[in-house]
Amino acid sequence: MLKSLNDEVLQSHVERFNEGVRSGDFSRMLEQFTEDAELAFEGVPVGPFRGRPAIAQAYADQPPDDEIVILRTRESGENLVVADYAWRAEPASRAGSMILRLRDAEIDRLLVTFG
């Protein structure tokens, strides 16, 4: 089965995120966001961050310390990807969901939920 463009963007985002966790450099991941993108979190008291510079600053100020793995894609629409994720340290335990809204194969909005 061929992967959809949305699934490819999700897979690329996870690979680039994990690369950033390992190296401390999230610049390749940030390239996937539109200039006016929004990063929001549900279940933790941070954000939202609007615009690529604000998102970059958020990752610089509070870099994640664990990689993520995708457990399953629950739903995928024309411009939307919803995926359950886990932290690599606990790959069998669902940590939350990532909801990516796309515009021209770039991330326009990313909502990360915990729990």
Residue ranges and their predicted role:
Residues 26-30, 35, 52, 56:
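An amphipathic alpha-helix signature
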Residues 1-4, 40, 56-115:
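A beta-strand edge to alpha-helix "cap/lid" segment located at domain peripheries
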Residues 14, 39-41:
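Short, flexible active-site loops
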Residues 1-31:
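Short, low-complexity N-terminal intrinsically disordered segments enriched in polar/charged residues
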Residues 14-17, 21, 33, 55, ...:
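Hydrophobic alpha-helical core bundles mediating ligand binding, dimerization, or RNAP-core interactions
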